[in-house]
Curated annotation (Swiss-Prot):
Annotated localization: Cell outer membrane; Bacterial flagellum basal body
Protein's job: Assembles around the rod to form the L-ring and probably protects the motor/basal body from shearing forces during rotation.
InterPro entries (UniProt xref): Flag_Lring (IPR000527)
HAMAP family the record matches: FlgH
Keywords: Bacterial flagellum, Cell outer membrane, Lipoprotein, Membrane, Palmitate, Signal
Name this polypeptide is given: Flagellar L-ring protein
Organism annotation: Pseudomonas syringae pv. syringae (strain B728a)
A Pfam family the protein falls into: FlgH
Record note on quaternary structure: The basal body constitutes a major portion of the flagellar organelle and consists of four rings (L,P,S, and M) mounted on a central rod.
Organismal lineage: Bacteria, Pseudomonadati, Pseudomonadota, Gammaproteobacteria, Pseudomonadales
GO BP: any one term: bacterial-type flagellum-dependent cell motility
Length: 237
């Protein structure tokens, strides 16, 4: 009983370790209701001012020389996504080496070499020589292109002491094959916000843009666990 239980236990441990390693190769799936991307509400609720019967009421004033752009915590900003990235790389290398050497011996242990070899009838010679050649060539190319367009409306999460706005938010779209997600977070200058309260994603500093999805369509674009094993660093070949 003990001889059979040890191999079975070893196989079980090896299987669990393999499953754990393969699961580590899987990219984390985005989930809804992430508290980090939840809408940020103003820290101090605005209290309704009492109506005193006057024409001009407190709390309803507007700046005659400005516009209604976001500049407070909880304000809303629409970010226009216009991301286009393209990268290409090529490398070529070639190395070659040729070598020729020869050694000629006219004496052995102080005695001259005879030219009459009684064995085989050939002359005796200890001359040696070799030729060597080595050539290495390599060629590599890589190209990648990405594009993301659209718009996401986010909220101001914080206002830095220098007036920079920290914004973040997300958009979930439920389709017939699953959910599509767009998340964005970064830093925005108030001067870069247009009069219609929009800002381009190219003007966001330290931008974190995520486009992902869940459902059948997202699952089919991911390789299975068996394929991930052959594509992982664990595969020795």
């Amino acid at each position: 009983m003990n001889r059979l239980s040890v191999p079975r236990f070893s196989v079980l441990i090896a299987s669990l370790c393999g499953i754990t390693l393969l699961s580590g190769c899987v990219a984390p799936t985005a989930k809804p209701n992430d508290p980090y991307y939840a809408p940020v509400l103003p820290r101090t609720p605005m209290s309704a001012a009492a109506n005193n019967g006057a024409i001009y009421q407190a709390g309803f004033e507007q700046n005659l020389y400005g516009d209604r752009k976001a500049f407070r915590i909880g304000d809303i900003i629409t970010i226009t996504l216009s991301e286009r990235m393209a990268a290409s790389k090529a490398a070529t290398s070639a190395m070659s080496k040729d070598s020729t050497n020869s050694i000629g011996l006219t004496s052995l242990f102080g005695s001259g070499l005879t030219t009459n070899n009684p064995i085989g009838g050939n002359d005796l010679s200890l001359n040696a020589g070799y030729n060597g050649a080595r050539t290495t060539k390599g060629d590599g190319k890589a190209a990648q292109s990405n594009s993301l367009t659209g718009s996401v409306t986010v909220t101001v999460a914080d206002v830095l002491p220098n007036g920079i706005l920290a914004v973040r938010g997300e958009k979930w779209m439920t389709l017939n094959t699953g959910d599509e997600l767009v998340r964005i977070a970064g830093l925005v200058r108030a001067d870069d916000i247009a009069t219609d309260n929009t800002v381009s994603s190219t003007r966001i500093a330290d931008a974190r843009i995520t486009y992902s999805g869940t459902g059948a369509f997202a699952d089919t674009s991911q390789p299975g666990w068996f394929d991930r094993f052959f594509l992982s660093p664990l595969f020795p070949f």
